[in-house]
From Swiss-Prot:
Catalyzes the conversion of L-lactate to pyruvate. Is coupled to the respiratory chain. FMN binds at residues 106, 127, 155, 251, 306-330. It catalyses: (S)-lactate + A = pyruvate + AH2. It comes from Escherichia coli O127:H6 (strain E2348/69 / EPEC). This is L-lactate dehydrogenase. Keywords: Cell inner membrane, Cell membrane, Flavoprotein, FMN, Membrane, Oxidoreductase.
Length: 396
């Protein structure tokens, strides 16, 4: 199969993976309206083509939290990467490290902090959920600090799990889920051999280390379901801000007032995100939410964005809408499931090439030159409601 875009990796991953795993990463909440709009709204953002600008000295490099990035992209936190490729978190981290961008380890990773951090030269980022078990949160933070993690990404848009109908249909949850997953695994031999057998242990490493016993998929679902905390408020985050002495990023912002609260709280960054359309269906796409948030806090706090980003053109669009850096989620997971570290490395190369083309043809020699002026007036900043119908194609 010829791979020329992230969509090719998605098609390949669907063939390789058991359905319960493919649909777990590919699906969203409820009817998946927001999930589809993430991609469609971003694709409708029109860039201004400019010509004869002498683009010979183009550079994608940028700086974030005193870290030099080869391009304004990081691999965002994605749970269960180690179920998509053998020791998947390590493979993805190595690809990011080689490309000169950050890798973010999820709380619910298969590979624990202590396995991933030593595998790369660059300090990784660590993502943490708001959980009832504050002992686990403190333990995870202590381990992340000890491993040299540079930035904490604190996810706040999950006080309760979203309702994901695809999971019940695919076997990730629902009646006879364990048996359905087993039958799917044995009929997908490439995955069964590479990950199912040779990718063990399939513990949730960060949770197992705390609980002192193995935690499989059923344990993961049960433990997390019992530990999400709907009572959380900004005040509950104060001890984390005091404990963590590195940059702290609040992930899950869609409203300008919440962005202002993050500035008042003292966060170093925010992620404009709807959790890839996996939490509340019907909320704004990140592309629609981003311009108003940038108007409210640009310059006061670092603005990251995710959800719907599939290629280098999308990266340029998000930056023009107001982001400083973007996070990749599904895009790199498709590549990881298809070809491991090599797949992620190739995806990052594709994104870099696509960014260079977009910047060359819009007259932006550097990341700082990608601004609202790079957008066609009326299509980028405002994103009117009639701009994009609900998507019928790929997930966000």
């Amino acid at each position: 199969m010829i791979i020329s875009a992230a969509s090719d990796y998605r098609a390949a991953a669907q063939r390789i993976l058991p359905p319960f795993l493919f649909h777990y990463m590919d699906g969203g909440a409820y009817s998946e309206y927001t999930l589809h709009r993430n991609v469609e709204d971003l694709s409708e953002v029109a860039l201004r083509q400019r010509i004869l600008k002498n683009m010979s000295d183009l550079s994608l490099e940028t700086t974030l939290f005193n870290e030099k990035l080869s391009m304004p992209v990081a691999l965002g936190p994605v749970g269960l990467c180690g179920m998509y490729a053998r020791r998947g978190e390590v493979q993805a981290a190595k690809a990011a490290d080689a490309h000169g961008i950050p890798f973010t380890l999820s709380t619910v990773s298969v590979c624990p902090i202590e396995e991933v951090a030593p595998a790369i030269k660059r300090p990784m980022w660590f993502q943490l959920y708001v959980l009832r078990d504050r002992g686990f949160m403190r333990n995870a933070l202590e381990r992340a600090k000890a491993a040299g993690c540079s930035t904490l990404v604190f996810t706040v848009d999950m006080p309760t799990p979203g309702a994901r109908y695809r999971d019940a249909h695919s076997g990730m949850s629902g009646p006879n889920a364990a048996m359905r997953r087993y039958l799917q695994a044995v009929t997908h031999p490439q995955w069964a051999w590479d990950v199912g057998l040779n990718g063990r242990p399939h513990d949730l490493g960060n949770i197992s280390a705390y609980l002192g016993k193995p935690t499989g998929l059923e344990d993961y679902i049960g433990w997390l379901g019992n530990n999400f905390d709907p009572s959380i408020s900004w005040k509950d985050l104060e001890w984390i801000r005091d404990f963590w002495d590195g940059p702290m990023v609040i992930k899950g912002i869609l409203d300008p007032e919440d962005a202002r609260d993050a500035v008042r709280f003292g966060a170093d960054g925010i992620v404009v995100s709807n959790h890839g359309g996996r939490q509340l269906d019907g909320v704004l796409s990140s592309a629609r939410a981003l311009p108003a948030i940038a108007d409210a806090v640009k310059g006061d706090i670092a603005i990251l964005a995710d959800s719907g980003i599939r290629n280098g053109l999308d990266v340029v669009r998000m930056i023009a809408l107001g982001a400083d850096t973007v996070l990749l989620g599904r895009a790199f997971l498709y590549a990881l499931a298809t070809a491991g570290q090599a797949g992620v490395a190739n995806l990052l190369n594709l994104i870099e090439k696509e960014m260079k083309v977009a910047m060359t043809l819009t007259g932006a020699k550097s990341i700082s030159e990608i601004t609202q002026d790079s957008l066609v007036q009326g299509l980028g900043k405002e994103l009117p409601a009639a701009l994009a119908p609900m998507a019928k194609g790929n997930a966000a």
